[in-house]
């Protein structure tokens, strides 16, 4: 939660800032702090199992995306009763919240591209949710991986795609 608190510190003082433990990042257990390559090298079976079923895969000593969705249920109910809100949290959590409000299958949430340094404005309406994205144009390394792909920052061997 350290990174999200650091991001939110720039919000004006009149914003009512709340910290909800339920919005913590997906707990990656023994893999916390490791890159995808380090996980692949140290825990090859776990890396393969996660690639096979990222939604249900639970890190050793950690959580799965399914666990995060269950953890977020009470928060989402609260969000639905709220007026305008701004959520500053981590990508996995944002993917789950985004999937809910965009009426997407939660089992596909791990592969949704929620870019870093982007404000995603969701406006619920009678016929669906309107989405507008505002990019901050801050340099960042994307670790997003589509299902069955390598992260954008990883360089596959020549001729391999």
Give short role names for the model-derived ranges.
Residues 127-161:
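Eukaryotic N-terminal low-complexity, Ser/Thr- and Lys/Arg-rich leader segments
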Residues 1-48, 99-104, 109-121, 160-161:
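Phosphate-coordination/substrate-recognition cap region in phosphate-metabolizing enzymes
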Residues 1-11, 58-73:
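Loop-to-helix element that buttresses phosphate recognition and phosphoryl-transfer chemistry
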Residues 43, 54, 72-76:
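Short amphipathic alpha-helical/adjacent loop interface patches that line ligand
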Residues 46-66, 146-148:
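Short glycine/proline- and acidic residue-enriched helix-loop micro-motifs
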Residues 5-6, 73-130:
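Active-site-adjacent alpha-helix immediately C-terminal to a catalytic or transition-state-stabilizing loop
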Residues 14, 42, 53, 81-82:
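Structured helix-beta-strand junction loops
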Residues 23-25, 53, 125:
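Short, solvent-exposed coil/turn elements at secondary-structure transition points
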